[in-house]
Swiss-Prot record:
It is found in: Mitochondrion membrane; Mitochondrion. Keywords: Cell cycle, Membrane, Mitochondrion, Transit peptide, Transmembrane, Transmembrane helix. Predominantly expressed in the root meristem, in the primary and lateral root tips. Also present in leaves and pollen. Changing E346K: In rrg-1; shorter root due to a reduced number of dividing cells affecting postembryonic root meristem size. GO terms for biological process: regulation of cell division; regulation of DNA endoreduplication; regulation of root meristem growth. This is Protein RETARDED ROOT GROWTH, mitochondrial. GO terms for cellular component: mitochondrial membrane; mitochondrion. Residues 1-49 form a transit peptide. It is a single-pass membrane protein. It comes from Arabidopsis thaliana (Mouse-ear cress). Belongs to the RMD1/sif2 family. The chain crosses the membrane at residues 346-362. The keyword Transit peptide applies. It comes from the Eukaryota.
């Protein structure tokens, strides 16, 4: 009976291999048109049915024999297994403004159709081919075979599945439509991994997130939080410079006991502080919840997890505390300037009164001299 089972398995294998040669990939911007052997390989992994139970498993895992260990190990693998299949994410903050309309017009064939009414970002999709040009059905259906770039109007660009050697080529697309380019870009790294057999919709890990399903909306959600985080990081660095500048002013006042800053310089510091808080709240939209996250709970879960992971609220709280310190110093320095102006006006008034008294004395002396004559 075992021989007949082996012959039947061999015939089934040959039939599947022959039928797979007639299959072609459907047209997609991210896959080539080479024939696929993915369907055959998937069928070959099915168990050959028999009336007699087999004494040993012919599978690499024990899921078919009734054991749940395979599913448990699938979720919690070794470090090597966890690193396998990760899609790298690179977040950049390279300018203070990006013309999204011009960028969209130039890369129209790569634009991912929007799923929300938000106009402060665009998502671009680029093809990615394997060296052999052969894909399985699972690979064709996954967005992990494409490169994505999510660009935000306030200056952030998030790259998905882009190698380090290709980063500059993608960022050049952004630079052509950017204004206020920074001399030194801000950068952050993250990763995402797709596990269709994951029990939950998502699971967090060290410096990466595991999703049950990775789609373009997930990419948008991840990009929005990372874009806000890297922009917030830039704003914090700018505010830190202002704090250090005011600290130098206070140290100088402690040593000399005088305040020598000009009114123009103080107004410039006030403008920098106000523009930083306005950019974070209005342009970056730090407190504006994504429309995609409003519609579906699984995207909301990703959104909330990443905001907690990147400590968005806590970091903004620290930024707000530093801005309040700056605001307190500005009010103090303004009072010092006003007092200095008041002192100057008082001295001017005293000088004018002295002149008036001198003129009065002169007239009295002159009248007295005329009367004596």
């Amino acid at each position: 009976m075992g021989k007949w089972r082996a012959v039947a398995a061999l015939l089934l294998r040959n039939q599947l291999l022959n039928s797979s040669k007639r299959l072609n990939l459907s047209s997609s911007p991210c896959v080539s048109k080479h024939p696929t052997i993915g369907l055959a390989s998937r069928f070959l992994n099915f168990r050959h049915f028999s009336a007699f139970p087999s004494p040993i498993s012919i599978y690499n895992n024990d899921s078919d024999s009734g054991s749940n260990d395979a599913y448990q190990n699938y979720e919690f693998g070794t470090e090597a297994e966890e690193a396998l299949g990760k899609i790298p994410i690179k977040a950049y903050f390279l300018s203070t403004s990006i013309d999204l309309k011009a960028m969209q017009a130039e890369n129209l064939c790569n634009v991912v159709p929007p799923t929300s009414r938000s106009t402060n970002y665009i998502a671009l999709k680029f093809s990615d081919f394997t060296p052999s040009g052969i894909y399985s059905l699972d690979e064709r259906e996954s967005v992990s075979n494409c490169k994505f770039m999510v660009v935000f109007q306030y200056g952030s660009a998030i790259l998905f599945n882009v190698d380090d050697n290709d980063v500059d080529r993608y960022l050049d697309i952004v630079r052509r439509h950017a204004s206020g380019l920074l001399t030194e870009m801000r950068k952050d790294d993250y990763a995402v991994k797709e596990k269709p057999l994951l029990i939950e919709e998502m699971k967090g890990g060290p410096d990466y997130i595991v999703l049950k399903t990775l789609d373009t909306n997930s990419i948008r959600i991840i990009g929005s939080v990372l874009g806000q985080s890297i922009a917030l990081d830039y704003s914090v660095s700018q505010v830190n410079k202002l704090v250090e500048e005011f600290a130098d002013i206070n140290r100088s006042m402690a040593k000399t006991g005088t305040f020598t800053m000009t009114r123009k310089k103080l107004f410039q510091l006030v403008g920098k502080a106000n523009s930083n808080i306005a950019d974070v709240i209005l342009k970056v939209g730090l407190f504006e919840r994504s429309e995609i996250a409003w519609r579906e709970a699984r995207y909301a879960q990703i959104y909330e997890y990443l905001r907690e992971e990147y400590e968005i609220s806590q970091r903004f709280g620290d930024l707000d505390y530093k801005l309040k310190f700056i605001e307190h110093n500005i009010h103090f320095l303004q009072e010092v300037m006003q007092n200095r102006q008041s002192d100057l006006l008082e001295w001017c008034i005293i000088f004018l009164l002295a002149i008036e008294n001198a003129i009065g004395i002169y007239e009295i002396v002159r009248e007295s001299a005329g009367a004596s004559l």
